[in-house]
From Swiss-Prot:
Highest taxon in the source lineage: Eukaryota
Lineage: Eukaryota, Rhodophyta, Florideophyceae, Rhodymeniophycidae, Gracilariales
Gene: tsf
Name of the protein in question: Elongation factor Ts, chloroplastic
This protein's record includes keyword Protein biosynthesis: yes
Function: Associates with the EF-Tu.GDP complex and induces the exchange of GDP to GTP. It remains bound to the aminoacyl-tRNA.EF-Tu.GTP complex up to the GTP hydrolysis stage on the ribosome.
Amino acid sequence: MNNMNIQISSHFVKELRSKTGAGMMDCKKALQAADGDMVVAAETLRKKGLVSADKKSTRLALEGVIDSYIHTGSRIGVLIELNCETDFVARRIEFQQLARDLAMQIAACQNIFYVSINNIPQNIIDREIRIESAKEDIFNKSPEMKDQIVKGRVGTRLKEMSLMNQPFIKDQNISIEDLVKQHIALLGENIKVRRFQRFLLGETLDMI
């Protein structure tokens, strides 16, 4: 049986969140994986470095680094601004390695254009909806089914554009969002990907 299909009461999710400070979805996933065992779920969150990470995510992050990555052959380059709360953490090797890993991720995944889905402009979302709605394979579907298919496909496309939704290239079992949360818990400060820019040799300006 797939543990992720287990129904977990919102009461237990809120209780685990209260005890650990982890995000609601992280708590729900941990409880599902632990078959509802609160102690096991809390330990899972602790091992993943997610305990208290959510509590730190609202604090201002104004320090940090601007890092760069140039891929082999010098045909792809990335600049990224990664923020934290203090210069002390900005100098930590773990923080600097995170910046480098994120830059490598952006270089490797050329469909990424935004930090998160929340950063995607509405005109881009509307364009994706129009593209999916015009596809021939859904012409004969009922309006309800068509809307459902379009919503699913657009959701998938938006995740492909978002850095935070990508599986980490060094560990496909975690997302970039999870990776950042782990470093928030490890370093004890809020961490934010502020912005990034990818450069492709010979690229046009109108990428998307």
